[in-house]
Design a protein with these regions (language model features):
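Conserved nucleotide-sugar phosphate-binding/catalytic loop shared by glycosyltransferases and other
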Residues: 34-78, 88
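Donor-nucleotide binding loops and adjacent catalytic segments primarily
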Residues: 44, 190-284
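A nucleotide-sugar donor-handling region in carbohydrate enzymes
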Residues: 44-46, 149-221
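A donor-sugar binding/catalytic signature common to diverse glycosyltransferases
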Residues: 103-104, 111, 126, 152, ...
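C-terminal amphipathic helix plus adjacent low-complexity
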Residues: 341-388
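A short, Lys/Arg-enriched amphipathic alpha-helix followed by its capping loop at the start of a domain
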Residues: 23-33, 231-235
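Active-site and donor-binding regions of nucleotide-sugar-utilizing enzymes
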Residues: 6, 10-13, 17-28, 65-170
């Protein structure tokens, strides 16, 4: 009997689980894969909705949990949480001894998993390398993960070329599309109206989703927030604020959003939604407003407009459904108004998403289940030097 491949996948929060859900489903079901799902960070935090429960509810399963997140709202707290994660994951991976570890995207917590994998000589597979988000530390994290990894699954061909330009051997780099788009193509989403009603919205009336996070590359990570709230104060329609990521400044975002919601009965603050409920709510929204990659990468797949505020997503590819705007109240108001015009709404129906077709999981599975995970994967070689 063929030995099963020991593959560990790390997940820290709803931010990456919404991408990983179908890949975890396929890995768990594959007869030649021994999957270990390791959850840590915000997943285990009651403050951020204890989203580890989403994994079990979706059938992904959780094999190991590692407590790592300090109760903090500072950059020092982030740095210390990273150290705690490194200690905890070192023990976990030393005991599990996976043959391959899968990390996703650009969350700073992933650096802990990558560092442990490096020192334990475990090959690393990285999903979503080569993307850009120049207004956050995520960009540097993503590039660091690329150089620490041995397999790369990129969202676009442009991202694939960037990874190769960083010195990675082309055979290691696979363009698969964005994993999160598999949420649209695999199974039917719950009715948007039903999800809206469950969180207190009037399903018959328009709603806007606001998804915004601290700009972690800035000293004042929430400097954009007053302009955002000023713009939203004159918006006609229901508003759903989604909790931010667990970064420095997140509590400021939560506090001000909650205060804003207290002044208007049509404003709701949601800690977390399961991935498919979030996608359903987004599919029925008038627009998504904020600085989340969800608007830039995902909204086009459900033909929804996105207003991208500020610098957090600078450099990231996006479709024509996205309207970029500086963090200025009047500019934000004008951008929202543009997305609600009849011509823009009509054009949305035919706008393409540059991040793929929603079949990324099956492409990743083909590589993970066939690639040689021996020494040839672990040992990387620099590209040949140009000769004069």
């Amino acid at each position: 009997m063929t030995n099963r491949r020991r593959i560990a996948v790390v997940t820290t929060s709803r931010a990456d689980f919404s991408h990983l859900q179908w890949l975890l489903h396929d890995l768990r079901a594959h007869p030649l894969v021994d999957l270990k799902v390791v959850a840590f960070g915000p997943h285990l935090s009651p403050e951020f909705g204890r989203t580890v429960d989403f994994l079990n509810d979706a059938g992904a399963g959780v094999d190991e949990t590692v407590e790592t997140l300090l109760s903090s709202d500072s950059d020092v707290g982030m740095a210390k949480s990273l150290g705690v994660a490194t200690l905890g994951l070192a023990d976990t991976f030393a005991r599990l001894r996976p043959e391959l570890i899968v990390v996703t995207a650009d969350r700073y917590e992933m650096l802990a998993a990558a560092s442990v994998a490096l020192t334990l000589r475990i090959p690393l597979a990285h999903i979503e390398g080569g993307d850009l988000s120049e207004g956050a530390i995520d960009d540097a994290v993503r590039n660091a993960l690329t150089k620490l990894s041995h397999l790369h699954f990129t969202t676009t061909d442009r991202a694939r070329r960037r990874v190769i330009a960083m010195g990675e051997e082309p055979w290691r780099v696979h363009c698969v599309g964005a994993l999160s788009l598999d949420q649209v193509t695999r199974g039917s989403l719950p009715p948007a109206g039903a999800v809206a009603a469950r969180i207190g919205l009037r399903p018959a009336d328009p709603w806007f989703i606001v998804a915004c996070h601290p700009e972690t590359l800035q000293v004042q990570t929430t400097a954009w927030l007053p302009a955002m709230l000023d713009a939203l104060a004159t918006l006609h329609g229901q508003i759903v604020f989604c909790f931010p990521n667990a970064d420095a400044g997140s509590r400021d975002v939560i506090a001000r959003a909650s205060e804003f919601a207290g002044t208007r009965p049509d404003v709701h603050v949601v800690v977390n939604l399961p991935p498919r409920e979030y996608w359903s709510l987004m599919s029925g929204a008038a627009a998504l407003v904020g600085n989340s990659s969800s608007g830039v990468m995902e909204a086009a797949s459900v033909h929804v407009a996105a207003v991208n505020v500020g610098s957090r997503q600078d450099g990231r590819e996006h479709g024509e459904n996205v309207v970029d705007t500086p963090a200025d109240a009047e500019a934000i108001r004008q951008a929202i108004a543009r997305t609600q015009s009849e011509s823009f709404q009509r054009a949305l129906k035919t706008m393409a998403n540059p991040y793929g077709d929603g079949h990324a999981a099956e492409r990743i599975m083909r590589v993970l289940t066939t690639v040689d995970i021996g020494a040839s994967l672990l040992v990387k070689h620099a590209p040949p030097r140009d000769t004069d």
